[in-house]
């Protein structure tokens, strides 16, 4: 064999195994880096989306109904009604005129009757024999009864069922109503600040300002809902009998 065309190969001219693997490993490493970058980008997008969602949820204002349900036991009104809040400046100085205050007249008595009379409610969810009413109307009934009791010597309330009972029961009814109003006030615990105003005409030099900002539930809507769900028939007539309008008592001639 002619060996003239051959020449010796030096050791450094022979590629090592690692050098033979280098192109393949380089491609694999490049692919891995691309996947790593993609994973990091997706992870960043996911974290940003999660933080944005938490921010939106954390700053979203709950509805009036949602808030009310946190502060009240079950009520059919909170399931069916539209709880609307009203913000206004209340006029309530010491001698503020009102259709509900002052010496009893047929007009004042009628105004009070309209506040609470048609409150009976039947819930068809539990069958036709489930009867009840919203507590606000019981509270108004109690306040009205205490008001009438303070004027019982000046006005003829003989047609009011509560006053036809024995005096012990009448007194018990009044005390029950006072307790009901006390508990209601303490339960609500209105924390609206009442500020003082300078008033040189007063000995103390100041007076309380009861004309304050208020945020209240829309009572008209609550009343409309109660009337729309009121029981009709004899029951309503029997309930209404306890608030029959009276007439001013005639003073005895001497």
From Swiss-Prot:
Location(s) in or outside the cell: Membrane
Membrane topology type: Single-pass membrane protein
Pathway stated in the Swiss-Prot or TrEMBL entry: Mycotoxin biosynthesis
Single GO cellular component term: membrane
Chain positions of motif HXXHC 1: 138-142
Family recorded in the similarity comment: Belongs to the ustYa family.
Function in brief: UstYa family oxidase; part of the gene cluster that mediates the biosynthesis of the phomopsins, a group of hexapeptide mycotoxins which infects lupins and causes lupinosis disease in livestock. Within the pathway, phomYc' catalyzes the desaturation of the Ile moiety into 2,3-dehydroisoleucine (dIle). The pathway starts with the processing of the precursor phomA' by several endopeptidases including kexin proteases as well as the cluster-specific S41 family peptidase phomP1 and the oligopeptidase phomG' to produce 10 identical copies of the hexapeptide Tyr-Val-Ile-Pro-Ile-Asp.
Name of the protein: UstYa family oxidase phomYc'
